[in-house]
Amino acid sequence: LGKEAAVKAIKEWGQPKSKITHLIFCTTSGVDMPGADYQLTKLLGLRPYVKRYMMYQQGCFAGGTVLRLAKDLAENNKGARVLVVCSEVTAVTFRGPSDTHLDSLVGQALFGDGAAALIVGSDPIPEIEKPIFEMVWTAQTIAPDSEGAIDGHLREAGLTFHLLKDVPGIVSKNIDKALVEAFQPLNISDYNSIFWIAHPGGPAILDQVEQKLGLKPEKMKATREVLSEYGNMSSACVLFILDEMRKKSAQQGLKTTGEGLDWGVLFGFGPGLTIETVVLHSVAL
């Protein structure tokens, strides 16, 4: 699954795969040695000295984590081109219903399989590389008083997830602080004036965030469409939403990849409860 996504990303990028300097692979679907990063390097025929980073068991916030790491690598290694791949196969979480763990049914109802890939770099080559979004600022934080809100354990039975019912409340309670930290330096306080890419942990989370911030329903349109079409694909979701947004923006003749707007936010929520924040700037279409 990850290979298919990577092949598509490299083709659209338009550069030879020999130009890839770093690989970040993220999955919550299993643990192997050598890891999925090694397997993908072999499957794609990448150079053996590509610098690899393997992220296991991070959960749903990791779509933001991989972007943050890729940004740091690209900015601190001149000429770096980072292949980012998130691949999730949620069959490892599937099991029969249990009276003692009804919360795991919520996850099984929401989860889906998916893989997404992109290339991250700085100083794009004119006429060859066509950026889609620019990452301006990133942050990671642990929400206060949230320990145990989302957790997972890899055991003989597979991957078990446990979700507290107040997860949507914890996310909505902490999102305002994250937004102020991200957008105050840009003098942005109207969150309807930016585009939104939020990890769709479930409809209840999106509903509470909309209500808390007074967001217009169309702000979460791309997010809800991905959740409806594919389910919660853990780390891959926010990358699917990025793709959905830039394609719809082009189809509708809007002026930027971010629904015609300049600034936007990408949020990842997951075990901890951990929140990843990425401030994005769109690119003219």
Curated annotation (Swiss-Prot):
Q: Which residues cross the membrane?
A: none
Query: Which CDD domains would you find in this protein's record?
Result: CHS_like
Query: What InterPro entries does the annotation carry?
Result: Chalcone/stilbene_synt_C, Chalcone/stilbene_synt_N, Chalcone/stilbene_synthase_AS, Polyketide_synthase_type-III, Thiolase-like
Q: Which domain of life is it from?
A: Eukaryota
* Annotated pathway: Secondary metabolite biosynthesis; flavonoid biosynthesis
Keywords tagged on the record: Acyltransferase, Flavonoid biosynthesis, Transferase
Question: Which residues does the entry assign to the active site, renumbered to this chain?
Answer: C60
Q: What is its EC number?
A: 2.3.1.74
SUPFAM superfamilies from the xrefs?
A: Thiolase-like
UniProt enzyme class: transferase
* Record GO terms (molecular function): naringenin-chalcone synthase activity
What is an example of a Pfam family matching this protein? Chal_sti_synt_C
Give the catalysed reaction(s), semicolon-separated. (E)-4-coumaroyl-CoA + 3 malonyl-CoA + 3 H(+) = 2',4,4',6'-tetrahydroxychalcone + 3 CO2 + 4 CoA
Q: Which PROSITE patterns does UniProt cross-reference here? A: CHALCONE_SYNTH
Q: Tell me the GO BP annotations in alphabetical order.
A: flavonoid biosynthetic process; polyketide biosynthetic process
The record's function comment reads: The primary product of this enzyme is 4,2',4',6'-tetrahydroxychalcone (also termed naringenin-chalcone or chalcone) which can under specific conditions spontaneously isomerize into naringenin.
Which protein family is named in the record?
Belongs to the thiolase-like superfamily. Chalcone/stilbene synthases family.
**Name of the featured protein:** Chalcone synthase 6-4
What organism does the UniProt record list as the source?
Medicago sativa
Q: Which gene encodes it?
A: CHS6-4
